[in-house]
Amino acid sequence: MKKKIWKSSASIEDLIKRSNIISNIRLFFSKKNILEVETPILSRSTVTDVHLTSFETNYISSDNIDELKLWLTTSPEYHMKRLLASESGSIYQICHSFRNKEIGRYHNPEFTMLEWYQPFCSMKKFIKEIDIFLQIILKCNKSDKVSYQDLFIDFLKIDPLCTNLLELHQISKKLKLDHLTHSENNLNKLIQLLFTLKIEPNIGKEKPLFVYHFPAEQASLAAINLKDPRISERFEIFFKGIELGNGFYELIDVNEQKKRFIRDNKERRSMNLPTRKIDNFFLSALSYGLPPCSGVAIGLDRLIMLILNKKSIHEVIAFPVDRC
């Protein structure tokens, strides 16, 4: 019988449950007096991150003369940080974000994200706050915490902070991954590949796991650790072998942030990817003064998928890309 692809891929019963979960999330933040905000999903700039591909469109003036290139946001991060610089205090947002070239069991080009920022909050304290959130919403046990370095030592018997190409190629061959790694000579890319294929699917099985202090090369928009410049103040959350969230003790140094954007575009050129215009509104906010803060982005579709014991986020979204 032909599939009724006009229908929702999620059952109405599950969509009601989804709505209730999101209501409970809003209640959690309301009780903590954290402000819910709304920011644009269209932006004049986009991210420079080489791992993200943005959707673009054009605004056309009514006389059809002027065009303005706009981007669908991959996350609300830059706009929310501009609010933080405007002294918003603690804020959160539940919104749709958009990432091209992403489809699969845990991916849809349009997805729902929870983004949350706490000014004057250390990474360690913020992880405790998120842990409480997960216990309430997921109804799970208290999470575990482990450093990125210790995770590699436990699983692969190598130290990612002082390894070398020879050692990484040897372990890749031992793990029968050499068909993927034999031509790769970028240390950081090899480390990320090993993490994704051999560690990530096997962690957080019984309860959520926070992996913190990612290598400095993977800092993204996180600050570098003051005591050890080899590591960043970045963490990720895993549960049942799935990445649920990505967080930082945020970088607030405008000059360092600009250097990272430039470095991203340099890497884009080397990979034959289009360079991206740097978001000067965001840099101006950093220059004005972003308060010391921690933030996290959590994939709500994945979170709801786990709560409802589904195997794909497409089972908790009404109309994923194949039905939209």
From Swiss-Prot:
Entry superkingdom: Bacteria
Binding site for ATP: 99-101, 108, 243-244, 299
EC number: 6.3.2.-
GO cellular component labels: cytosol
Any GO BP: lysyl-tRNA aminoacylation
The entry's keywords: ATP-binding, Ligase, Nucleotide-binding
Catalytic activity entry: D-beta-lysine + L-lysyl-[protein] + ATP = N(6)-((3R)-3,6-diaminohexanoyl)-L-lysyl-[protein] + AMP + diphosphate + H(+)
EC top class named in words: ligase
Gene Ontology molecular function: acid-ammonia (or amide) ligase activity; ATP binding; lysine-tRNA ligase activity; tRNA binding
Amino-acid positions noted as binding substrate in the UniProt annotation, renumbered to this chain: 75-77, 117, 250
HAMAP family: EF_P_modif_A
PANTHER family assigned to the protein according to its UniProt record, in alphabetical order: ELONGATION FACTOR P--(R)-BETA-LYSINE LIGASE, LYSYL-TRNA SYNTHETASE
Function description: With EpmB is involved in the beta-lysylation step of the post-translational modification of translation elongation factor P (EF-P). Catalyzes the ATP-dependent activation of (R)-beta-lysine produced by EpmB, forming a lysyl-adenylate, from which the beta-lysyl moiety is then transferred to the epsilon-amino group of a conserved specific lysine residue in EF-P.
Family: Belongs to the class-II aminoacyl-tRNA synthetase family. EpmA subfamily.
The protein's assembly and partners: Homodimer.
Name this protein carries in UniProt: Elongation factor P--(R)-beta-lysine ligase
